Amino acid sequence: MSSMEKHLFNLKFAAKELQRNSKKCDKEEKAEKVKVKKAIQKGNMEVARIHAENAIRQKNQSVNFLRMSARVDAVAARVQTAVTMNQVTKSMAGVVKGMDATLKSMNLEKISGLMEKFERQFETLDVQTAQMEDSMSSTTTLTTPQGQVDTLMMEMADEAGLDLNMELPQGQTGSVGTSVASAEQDELSQRLAKLRDQV
């Protein structure tokens, strides 16, 4: 295993560890919410407020861990592409030297700084790999198109039977959402017309 492959393994491991930390925070948030409810039932508002603050803090920490996990995972995917294409530059190799200790620390600020260095390296690597990625139809990018994210979130909300009131930027209306909405609107208009005819 080359040193770059070892670093790649450590990146993937760190992404999983960050995800685990996120789930741990989720559990702690739920436990704090239960404590809030119990404190309110006992009429102890001061204790309820403390547990509510803890719940919010755990929720925010969970989101931060999850966001960083996704970021590390995206960088790992880019390193994988670079390793596969044998395009690991000297400057990129320099960035990874202190990486292992940073990832093991689970310090979000340090990991964020490390990811920024990687992302800068990938900006230059992108120019070199664009042609190769096009031919491979690679979908590995550091950012995900927001329209696709919004559409997926709407689909998941529909499956769960929830109403997801999301403000989509103009010009990015999801075709799935609009066709369903217009069909529902047509049906509602027809029912309203029938009711008017009856009255």
Swiss-Prot record:
It is found in: Cytoplasm, Cytosol; Endosome; Late endosome membrane. Belongs to the SNF7 family. Its main location: cytoplasm. Probable peripherally associated component of the endosomal sorting required for transport complex III (ESCRT-III) which is involved in multivesicular bodies (MVBs) formation and sorting of endosomal cargo proteins into MVBs. MVBs contain intraluminal vesicles (ILVs) that are generated by invagination and scission from the limiting membrane of the endosome and mostly are delivered to lysosomes enabling degradation of membrane proteins, such as stimulated growth factor receptors, lysosomal enzymes and lipids. Residues 170-182 have a biased composition (Polar residues). It is a peripheral membrane protein. Residues 167-199 are annotated as: Disordered. Signal peptide: none annotated. Keywords: Coiled coil, Cytoplasm, Endosome, Membrane, Protein transport, Transport. A motif (MIT-interacting motif) lies at residues 186-196. One of its GO terms (cellular component) is ESCRT III complex. This is Charged multivesicular body protein 1b. The gene is chmp1b. Probable peripherally associated component of the endosomal sorting required for transport complex III (ESCRT-III). The keyword Coiled coil applies. Residues 10-30, 178-199 form a coiled coil. It comes from the Eukaryota. InterPro entries: Snf7_fam (IPR005024). GO terms for biological process: endosome transport via multivesicular body sorting pathway; late endosome to vacuole transport; protein transport. It comes from Danio rerio (Zebrafish).
